Regions:
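Basic, flexible linker segments flanking DNA-binding modules
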Residues: 1-27, 121, 175-183
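RNase H-like two-metal-ion nuclease catalytic core shared by retroviral integrases
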Residues: 8-10, 92-103, 114-136, 149-156, ...
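Mobile genetic element proteins and their domesticated derivatives, centered on retroelements
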Residues: 19, 35, 51, 57, ...
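An active-site-proximal beta-strand-loop segment
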Residues: 21, 25-60, 66-67
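Active-site beta-loop-alpha junctions of metal-dependent nucleic acid enzymes
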Residues: 44, 62-84
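Short small-residue beta-strand/loop micro-motif enriched in glycine and branched aliphatics
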Residues: 56-62, 115-117, 141-142
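C-terminal domain-tail junction helix/linker
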Residues: 108-112, 136-187
């Protein structure tokens, strides 16, 4: 897989960084972080959007598509198989694809507070950035995608593997699902 620099427009709204690099959370689905990346598919650039639960680093929503836009983000949101009312905070970088009426409507409907990274500071969204880096290393670089359907199928398999079989050092070397299950037993 090949990569290239994609300069992006930024969201200039005056929204604070409410997350403020507090990446450890006490409850599942309390705080989600998100980011997008690009991947070569059959000679053209396509995009992947991930939503990650900070509690256990689980990928709870994902999508792939030809365009880096709000539709890609909303498709990832629609795949979240949890009660969205649990989410208190949604944090992203300042990418324009997250600044959209549809996304605003979802956040407002479920009373989810928006948080944005400081402009030009990837450390403010470090968990999402690290997850994307792992995905590129473990998944994207290992594959050659012929079409969007193949990317979507392989992404589904990767997310399943990532959540259920890949141990995380930040989770005492448990998988995201095992960590959450252990927490649910002790609560």
């Amino acid at each position: 897989a090949k990569y290239k620099n994609h300069p992006k427009e930024t969201n200039e709204k005056r929204i604070k960084n409410h997350l403020n690099r507090a990446f450890n959370r006490e409850q599942p689905m309390e705080t989600l972080v998100s980011d997008l990346t690009y991947v070569k598919v059959g000679g053209t650039w396509h995009y992947i959007c991930l939503f990650i639960d900070l509690f256990n680093r689980e990928i709870v929503g994902y999508s792939a598509g030809k365009n880096k836009d709000a539709n890609l983000v909303s498709k990832a949101i629609s795949r979240i198989n949890h009660n969205l009312e649990q989410i208190k905070l949604f944090h992203t970088d300042r990418g324009k694809e997250f600044d959209n009426h549809l996304i605003d409507e979802v956040l407002e409907t479920f009373k989810i507070k928006r948080s944005l990274s400081t402009k030009g500071c990837p450390y403010d969204n470090a968990v999402a950035e690290a997850t994307m880096k792992a995905m590129k290393t473990e998944f994207v670089k290992q594959m050659q995608f012929e079409n969007l359907e193949q990317l979507e199928t392989e992404l589904f398999d990767y997310v399943n593997w990532y959540n259920n079989f890949r141990p995380h050092s930040s989770l005492q070397y448990l998988t995201p699902v095992a960590f959450k299950n252990l927490h649910m037993k002790t609560v």
